[in-house]
Amino acid sequence: IEPERQEEEEEETRQRVRRGQVRQQQQ
């Protein structure tokens, strides 16, 4: 398992959560 890949996955999850929060705020 590459640590770099883990970081990328964490970033993607963070972005998704952030987008979800923004969507909730818009609603």
Curated annotation (Swiss-Prot):
Provide this UniProt record's keywords sorted from A to Z.
Answer: Metalloenzyme inhibitor, Metalloprotease inhibitor, Protease inhibitor
| Acidic residues bias: start-end ranges | 1-12
Keyword Transferase recorded:
no
Give the top-rank taxon of the lineage listed in the UniProt record for this protein.
Eukaryota
Q: Which GO terms describe its molecular function?
A: peptidase inhibitor activity
- Chain residue ranges for the region called Disordered: 1-27
Q: Report if keyword Ribosomal protein is assigned.
A: no
Q: What is the recorded function of this protein according to its Swiss-Prot or TrEMBL entry?
A: Metalloproteinase inhibitor, active on a globulinase from L.albus seeds, thermolysin and gelatinase B.
UniProt protein name: Metalloproteinase inhibitor 1
Biological source species: Lupinus albus (White lupine)
